[in-house]
C-alpha cells in the first residue's frame, strides 16, 4: 500500500547500506517461520556497536558532470543533481554490557523535465511556444479565476534515512536489541510528451514518512531451550497534492495549438492521503532434543489503514478546442465526491489481522542427511466491514463484503544431502501464503457506493448541465445529485464471498559442487504454481452463478465473448481467485577465485518460463482489470507474464587491494549484464477518443475499465471467413 515503482514506500531504499551487516535472499525457504510473500524473502541484519568507537563519513555524487552532453552531434545542456551524504557512528554505552550504532543519510536528486515548449532548451521541444503557454495561462486566470502556474523545468526528490540500534546484554542468558528507523522524503512528479503539454499545476508533490521501531528479547533458559519475543511497529504517512493546491479543478483541452493540454489538480490527487500502521508480535520457542531441533511459534500482525481516495473531487472538465476553453464550453464532465460533502466521510478506515501458528522439526538423520518438516496455519480476518449497500445486495444477491475469515494451511518439507566431500543437494517443497497489496483490500472499503458517488455529463439530470459552468467549483445541483444518487449508481468494489487467500506451491532443488582450481558451481531449479487474486466485473448484462459472473452466450466474429457493460464509471468489480499461473526457473553459477580469494570471477545464467492470468500491475480495480491484455477479461487464460525475463546473463569481477593496510581493503567491481526484454503483445483499441464513440460496438467494453485498448489483437489467416479484407 503506497508503494512506488521501485517497490519501496519511499523515493529510494529506506535502508542506508552502511547500516547493513549482512543480507540473505530466500526464494523458497523450508522454514515455516517464513510466509506472506510471493517471489521470495530478503532479510537484513543491521550493524551493532562494539567495545570500540568507530564511524565513517561518506559522500556520493553523480550529477550532470558525469553525463554526456551530446547525442548524434547535437549538444544538450541540463542541470542534474544526484548526491548523498552519510555518516555512521557506533560504540559502547557501557563496556561489555550495552552498545549503540547510528547511521544517517541525506539524498537529493534533481532531474530535468524532458519535454518543454519550443525554445525552452528542453531535451524534447514541443510544437507549442512559450507565448502560447502564457496565453492559456492568462485565459485560465481571467476566465476561471485560478492560476495553472507555469512550466516545470526540473523535478526534485529528497530523502533522509536515520537508523539507531541499541544492544543490551541483560545477563549471560538474556539479550535485548532495539532498532529504530525513520525515513522522510518528498518528490515533485511532472509529465509530458511530444503531443501532450502539462502545466506545473498538473504535476504533484508526493510526501512520504515511514517510522519503524522494534525490540527483540532472546533468552537461553537452558542449554537446549531458547525463546524469542519480538515486537515491531511501522507507521507510514503519504500525501499527494498539486502545487496549485487541492481546491482547483482538472482541465483537459484536446486541441490547443495542436497539443493536448492538462491543467489543474491531477484527477487521482484531488483527494489522496494514506496513513497505515502495522503492529507485529512474535513468540518463538526452540528446543533441542537428541538429533532434533523443534521450533514452535505464534505470530499476530495487525494492519490499521486510513485511506482517502476520491477521483476528480473538484470536477474534471474536457474541452475540445482552445476556442471552447476560452468560451467556457466543455464537451464532457465528471466528478466524484462524498455524499456528505466532507472528505473525511469518504475515507476507508479499517483494520484487519493475520494470526499464525507454526511447528517445525529439523532432524539430523546422519552426518550427511538432514530432514525438515513443518506446518503453518495462517488466518486472515477483520471485524470491520464496508458500509453495507442494500441496493447492491438486492441486485446481486450478496453483500459488498470486505475481508472475511479466510485461512491457509502451509506444509513444508526439506532435505539436505551431502553427496560426497565436494557436492551436496538441497530439496524443498511447500505451500506458501501469498502477500496481497493492502490497497486491493482497501478498495472494498473505499468504493462501497454508499458514502461516495459520481456525476457525469453523460447521465446529467435535467436542468443540471455542468458543461457551461466549468471551473467555478462543483455546481450546487451536481453536489445535490451526488448526495441523492441511487446506491447502485456508483463504482462499487467488493471482495467476493468465494474469495480465499491465494497461495503458491513451490518445488526448489539446488545442487552445489566444488571444482578443481578454486572453482565452484551451483545449479538451481524452481517450479511454482500460484493461485492468483484478480478482479472480475459482474454488471455484464449476464446472470451470476452464485457470486461468479457467467460467460456471455453472444460472441464476436472471432469467438471472443461480448459483454454488455454499458455503464460509465459505475462498474461493479470484485476481487476473486483463479488458478493458475506457473513459473519455471533454472539458474547456473560458476565462481573462480584468484589470489587466495581476493579476486573472484562469477558467471551466471538464469532462464525462466513464467505464465500468469493477470499482471495486477496497479492499485485500482479498473486498471488491474483492464491493463493486462486478454481475450476474455472476466475469464482469463494463462499467458506469458508481463514480468518475465526469459534469459539473463550476469558476469562480475571483484578484486580486493590493500593500499591502506590489511584492515582497510579497497574493492573494485566490474559488472556485465545482458538480458531479454519484457514481453510485449499487440492489442487493438475499440474506442475513438473522449467523445464516447466506438469504432465497433462488437465487444461492448466500457472504456473506464481500461479494457477497450487491451484486447489482444485477432490475427486473421489467409481467406479467414471472420474477416473482410
Predicted features and spans:
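Short loop/turn motifs that connect adjacent beta-strands in outer-membrane beta-barrel proteins
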Residues: 32-35, 49-54, 94-97, 173, ...
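A beta-strand signature from Gram-negative outer-membrane beta-barrel systems
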Residues: 4, 14-60, 84-97
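Solvent-exposed loop/turn elements at secondary-structure boundaries
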Residues: 385-574, 579, 695-699, 704-713, ...
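Transmembrane beta-barrel strands of outer-membrane/channel proteins
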Residues: 57-63, 102-106, 178-182, 229-233, ...
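Transmembrane beta-barrel wall of Gram-negative outer-membrane proteins
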Residues: 78-186, 205-233, 376, 411
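Hydrophobic, lipid-facing positions within transmembrane beta-strands of outer-membrane proteins
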Residues: 11, 38-40, 83-87, 160-164, ...
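Short, solvent-exposed micro-motifs at the edges of structured domains
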Residues: 500-503, 518-725
